[in-house]
Amino acid sequence: MPVESGAGNDQPKRLTVLSGPSGVGKSTVVKELRRRRPEVWLSVSVTTRPPRPGETDGVEYYFVDDAEFDRLVAENELLEWAEFAGNRYGTPREPVLKRLAAGQPVLLEIDLNGARQVRANMPDAFLVFLAPPSWEELVRRLTGRGTESPEVIQRRLETARIELAAEKEFDVTLVNTSVHEVCDELLALIAAPSTQ
């Protein structure tokens, strides 16, 4: 499994941030990781997006209105937040801090800008970049979903170019050639003791 070092490997790894371009397999890797190691706590994001059929408040997301989201931002209750497709998403700060204080490993699955905000708010966070094996494979994965219009796919690919260019801002890069192998590597990083 290819692992490449980036900004520095001496950060504590209890708060792990997983990021990478759309279509790289973040959700699939996280689902496998949680299946194997349910004690790794995955933060539940807050969103202004309406629930989709089958979604439960507090499970997939915490669903809030714009006024509540504005309050969370104003009172600095989010580690990071961003707007996507007209909806806002954010990571509640308090549950993350509670889990970390209890010594529980915490995983955040967020985008590049969210990862940057977490690094600014919590410099000890360990940032992991999930990269595709190749640009061609990323294009294949995004177009193969069959769930989005060509315009949306094009926007995602443009964003992916920006995200791939920011790879060196991360502490380590994992190349997603195999979900099981990359999950093994991610679990090893999460379990690695802090060097501080």
UniProtKB/Swiss-Prot annotation:
Subcellular location: Cytoplasm
Gene Ontology cellular component annotations, sorted alphabetically: cytosol
Keywords associated with the record: ATP-binding, Cytoplasm, Kinase, Nucleotide-binding, Transferase
Annotated catalysed reactions: GMP + ATP = GDP + ADP
Domain Guanylate kinase-like: 13-191
SUPFAM superfamilies: P-loop containing nucleoside triphosphate hydrolases
Top-level taxonomic group: Bacteria
Function: Essential for recycling GMP and indirectly, cGMP.
EC number, UniProt record: 2.7.4.8
GO terms, molecular function: ATP binding; guanylate kinase activity
The protein's name: Guanylate kinase
Disordered: annotated span: 1-24
Signal peptide coordinates: none
EC top class, as a word: transferase
Residues binding ATP, per UniProt: 20-27
Family: Belongs to the guanylate kinase family.
